Amino acid sequence: MIATEQKKQIISNFARKAGDTGSTEVQIALIDARIKELNEHFKTHKKDFHSKTGLLRLVGKRKKLLDYLKRTELERYKKLIETLGLRK
């Protein structure tokens, strides 16, 4: 799990206004942090297939949110992709 301090930092970095915890950018950033954490977990636990299922679910959720953001607000999408270092 992501530490509370790390969550607060991610929320403050991607929030659109004070107290914003549910915007699309914040949700994508939190899911991305969890995905990166799971990838580190898999480096030592190669046969943890149950967690791999959860990882695939998170990747799908992030993709859906990214598609939504791209469809609704392209500039915010491009900025987020660049900040998170997702697509090349």
Curated annotation (Swiss-Prot):
It comes from the Bacteria. SMART domains: Ribosomal_S15. Transmembrane segments: none annotated. Keywords: Ribonucleoprotein, Ribosomal protein, RNA-binding, rRNA-binding. One of its GO terms (molecular function) is structural constituent of ribosome. InterPro entries: Ribosomal_uS15 (IPR000589), Ribosomal_uS15_bac-type (IPR005290), uS15_NS1_RNA-bd_sf (IPR009068). Coiled coil: none annotated. Pfam families: Ribosomal_S15. One of its GO terms (cellular component) is cytosolic small ribosomal subunit. GO terms for biological process: translation. One of the primary rRNA binding proteins, it binds directly to 16S rRNA where it helps nucleate assembly of the platform of the 30S subunit by binding and bridging several RNA helices of the 16S rRNA. Belongs to the universal ribosomal protein uS15 family. Part of the 30S ribosomal subunit. Forms a bridge to the 50S subunit in the 70S ribosome, contacting the 23S rRNA. This is Small ribosomal subunit protein uS15.
